[in-house]
Amino acid sequence: MVMEEGRSIEEGLLQLKNKNDDSECRITACVILSTFVAVCGSFSFGVATGYTSGAETGVMKDLDLSIAQFSAFGSFATLGAAIGALFCGNLAMVIGRRGTMWVSDFLCITGWLSIAFAKEVVLLNFGRIISGIGFGLTSYVVPVYIAEITPKHVRGTFTFSNQLLQNAGLAMIYFCGNFITWRTLALLGALPCFIQVIGLFFVPESPRWLAKVGSDKELENSLFRLRGRDADISREASEIQVMTKMVENDSKSSFSDLFQRKYRYTLVVGIGLMLIQQFSGSAAVISYASTIFRKAGFSVAIGTTMLGIFVIPKAMIGLILVDKWGRRPLLMTSAFGMSMTCMLLGVAFTLQKMQLLSELTPILSFICVMMYIATYAIGLGGLPWVIMSEIFPINIKVTAGSIVTLVSFSSSSIVTYAFNFLFEWSTQGTFFIFAGIGGAALLFIWLLVPETKGLSLEEIQVSLIHQPDERNQT
């Protein structure tokens, strides 16, 4: 009986798909404002990501830290984010997307202020962990919120702005870290969180979360604000309600649901993308760019400043192309580019060690780091979060989102902590390992990652639910 009802609901959803509704194509001021407010947290996260690169010298000198202590400090943000990932999904479901961002702001502000006024390593590490927990919440809820409020034809572009603002924060830390103290940098990291706290009072809640909790009147009000007061929101509201009803009838939303046959594929895609994003070396290269430049004999000040200048235009490429080229082409281009640049970095440091053409190592390393960050920014930097926000149905989004976010930050913490030790063990070997993982990432994307460009969230989720059956038939 439930299966028959589920099929009839799916048929109704597919019929709704064939109807045109211009209201879904509108980009209103409310959508733009809501996205801007949401990505303020992403900017602060970007500052935290590059903070160890910009603050390394000052922190180690002022607080007399060893390499091991500073490596631990660097990894504590991702460790905290992994802790936040355990709660992000449930928190976002219980108190909503806006409420979760408020909680994140409180944690991030507390953490940044603790770092800024730290006189000893204990308070420094406390601030890093607490802010990390906040970033764990932000990294999940921001792309989910943006994906749930934006029209489908620009959803990728708007959701990718999450990565753009992370890169903006990264650019600021690379640029300002050359002449601003590490304590002032921490205060700058807290500023976007204060802006978000205020801005959240003026933006609507996610209509899909409102449908999940049964607030149909608030759902309509949210859609009217997002699509315009004169818009016909009936089709979109019906589609959201139909899909919500379908997944609720189909499942009790327990942890075991994740391992149902129809959801395994999406879980493999979500977790796989996060693993290859981190183990291809992104967190290490971004966090310790100054260390790489120093080892290569290239000017740290010039290298980080140039990264700061070019990191935003690089992300803009992905922002422009994500809804034109699609997710898969950008991801494959990104994985290939990251693999090749890591291979060349390994070659550069091999030449340096063998004292063969070692004069090429500084400039080759600089070019490779720049190209690595560029190819990372257009694809694997932001698209795993875009796809994560799209592929999970509302009934498993809580648990699946938490697991995927936990995997991301746990693996990032491992890579960030281990990098300095790997770098001392074998500089060139470290990058050859990253290159090999990048090659495996290319194969994974080609074989498994679906294209979601131009589809509504409901259309994506219906098609992916049937993906295992379609694969068995072929």
From Swiss-Prot:
Its main location: membrane. The keyword Membrane applies. GO terms for cellular component: membrane. Expressed in young seedlings. GO terms for molecular function: sugar transmembrane transporter activity. Keywords: Membrane, Sugar transport, Transmembrane, Transmembrane helix, Transport. Induction: Triggered by NAC072/RD26 during senescence. The chain crosses the membrane at residues 27-47, 76-96, 106-126, 129-149, 159-180, 184-204, 266-286, 302-322, 329-349, 363-383, 403-423, 429-449. It is a multi-pass membrane protein. GO terms for biological process: response to nematode. InterPro entries: MFS_dom (IPR020846), MFS_ERD6/Tret1-like (IPR044775), MFS_sugar_transport-like (IPR005828), MFS_trans_sf (IPR036259), MFS_Trehalose_Transporter (IPR050549), Sugar/inositol_transpt (IPR003663), Sugar_transporter_CS (IPR005829). Belongs to the major facilitator superfamily. Sugar transporter (TC 2.A.1.1) family. Sugar transporter. This is Sugar transporter ERD6-like 17. It comes from Arabidopsis thaliana.
